[in-house]
């Protein structure tokens, strides 16, 4: 029924005025997208259990009354990970929430389907960064799109870690199209930004949303920002459904090679109360972003999603300190001054000179 509706809507003469994709998705689009994100959840969980060595994910399946469900997998008190979760969800409904209609008003009145996998890991050792991942697919009548990304949030600065994470995801993007990373990297800096703090959430990675067969790559909310400017300079870059499917698959599979070497390098490093206190303080920024700015959290709550799964991204322990200022010249100051601001991690050689005096390169 939905696909015949798509064809009827696309056949209307006013479609050219809308933002609806000109390309219909494959007839098995939902099944393939579901299988892809479920497969990523399985692969990532297996890899993380091997990386931790002791912790195991506990799975809880859930059903959404309005349609759909998912499986939440949570690891607690592992050797490496204090807490981490990897979710899969598949939900559908009749009425779209305001957060979606604001971006894609042409989807109004159509039954919708969304599936995705999301992950957040909070390591115990402050020298190991927190990491987040999300890959998703959405359909509603004439509208479909892919979205996703991965970003790294260090608590102590190591230039090599930031470069490795970015380099690995750049290669995954380049495997689909060489222009993608040029837009998705600054888009990540833009999205994971705490406006009330004037900080990025971390060193970024990649982020993309509303990717269909139309127009330019950037479909964000800042038409004058760096991502929009790069996208405009590139012109139209329409990607097919198959290319966008491959993009999510390639970057999802790149996660373990991007993150596991960082964990293996940092986990043996000794730390004390100072480092732990700073980690808990910086985790506060993570909580602030997820509860105030994150569109995924807002979408989940507006669609009556499973609250425990939506808030799984929050760290188990966190602290706030009024008026905190890092000691001048400290590693903590370097993190807040350099690693919470957008940087050209792969192209700016001057970053080495700023990090070297602090032992913050490798």
UniProtKB/Swiss-Prot annotation:
Keyword ATP-binding attached: no
EC number from the UniProt entry: 1.3.3.3
Gene Ontology BP terms: chlorophyll biosynthetic process; protoporphyrinogen IX biosynthetic process
Residues noted as binding substrate in the record, renumbered to the chain: 118, 134-136
Important for dimerization: region residues: 286-321
Site positions (Important for dimerization): 196
Location of the protein in the cell: Cytoplasm
Entry function: Involved in the heme and chlorophyll biosynthesis. Catalyzes the aerobic oxidative decarboxylation of propionate groups of rings A and B of coproporphyrinogen-III to yield the vinyl groups in protoporphyrinogen-IX.
Matches recorded under HAMAP family: Coprogen_oxidas
Family stated for the protein in its record: Belongs to the aerobic coproporphyrinogen-III oxidase family.
Quaternary context: Homodimer.
Protein name per its UniProtKB record: Oxygen-dependent coproporphyrinogen-III oxidase
Species per Swiss-Prot/TrEMBL record: Synechococcus sp. (strain CC9605)
């Amino acid at each position: 029924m939905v696909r015949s509706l798509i064809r009827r809507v696309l056949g209307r003469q006013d479609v050219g005025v809308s933002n609806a994709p000109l390309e219909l998705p494959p007839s098995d689009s939902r099944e393939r997208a579901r299988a892809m994100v479920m497969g990523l959840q399985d692969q990532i969980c297996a890899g993380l259990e091997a990386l931790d060595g002791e912790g195991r994910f506990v799975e809880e399946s859930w059903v959404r009354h309005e349609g759909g469900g998912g499986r939440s997998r949570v690891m607690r008190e592992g050797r490496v990970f204090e807490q981490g979760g990897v979710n899969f969800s598949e939900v559908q409904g009749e009425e779209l929430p305001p957060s979606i209609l604001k971006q894609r008003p042409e989807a109004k009145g159509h039954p919708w389907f969304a599936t995705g996998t999301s992950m957040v890991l909070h390591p115990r050792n402050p020298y190991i960064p927190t990491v987040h991942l999300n890959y998703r697919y959405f359909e509603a009548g004439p509208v479909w799109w892919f979205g996703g990304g991965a970003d790294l949030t260090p608590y102590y600065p190591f230039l090599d870690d930031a470069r490795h994470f970015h380099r690995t995801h750049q290669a995954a993007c380049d495997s689909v199209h060489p222009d993608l990373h040029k837009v998705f990297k600054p888009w990540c800096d833009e999205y994971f930004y705490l406006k009330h703090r004037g900080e990025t959430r971390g060193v970024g990675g990649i982020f993309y949303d509303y990717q269909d067969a139309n127009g330019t790559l950037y479909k964000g909310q800042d038409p004058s920002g760096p991502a929009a400017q790069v996208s405009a300079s590139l012109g139209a870059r329409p990607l097919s459904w198959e290319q966008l499917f491959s993009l999510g698959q390639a970057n999802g599979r790149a996660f373990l090679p991007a993150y596991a070497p960082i964990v293996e390098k940092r986990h043996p490093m000794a730390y004390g109360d100072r480092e732990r206190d700073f980690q808990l303080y910086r985790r506060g920024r993570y909580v602030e972003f997820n509860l105030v700015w994150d569109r995924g959290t807002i979408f989940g709550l507006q669609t009556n999603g499973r609250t425990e799964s939506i808030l799984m991204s929050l760290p188990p322990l966190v602290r706030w300190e009024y008026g905190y200022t890092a000691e001048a010249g400290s590693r903590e100051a370097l993190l807040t001054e350099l690693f919470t601001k957008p940087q050209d991690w792969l192209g700016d050689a001057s970053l080495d000179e700023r990090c070297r005096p602090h032992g913050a390169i490798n």
